From Swiss-Prot:
Protein name as annotated: Uncharacterized protein C7D4.08
Subcellular location: Mitochondrion
Chief site of localization: mitochondrion
GO cellular component term of the entry, any: mitochondrion
Key words, A-Z: Mitochondrion
Upper classification of the organism: Eukaryota, Fungi, Dikarya, Ascomycota, Taphrinomycotina
Length: 96
């Protein structure tokens, strides 16, 4: 499994949009004003170009910080779950 050390993060004031092609688990550690770290566990680390049609809205997330992650384009009817079991940590997993 490949781990990507850097990701393009753009701040915004709209619900989170995640662009992924093959995502297993994403963990976001955030503070009050900035993203402290982004840990990515993915199966394909090829960075792809993106456009608005590639965006998968994940508006169910209610974070103090709104941001966009531009990464592997992901198009699917797959459902997503999120769990905020730990303070300051968010885990997003793709369900088959």
């Amino acid at each position: 499994m490949n781990f990507v050390s850097s990701i393009l993060i753009r701040w915004c004031d709209v619900p989170v949009y995640i662009l992924l092609r093959k995502c297993v688990i994403y963990k976001f550690a955030y503070s009050s004003r900035k993203i402290e770290s982004v840990h990515c566990a993915i199966t394909d680390d090829e960075v792809m170009s993106y456009n608005n049609e590639d965006m998968v809205p994940f508006s169910a997330i209610n974070l103090p910080i709104r941001f966009l992650i531009f990464y592997n384009a992901f198009r699917s009817n797959t459902s997503w779950n999120y769990n905020e079991s730990q303070i300051g940590n968010l885990t997003i997993s793709k369900q088959s």
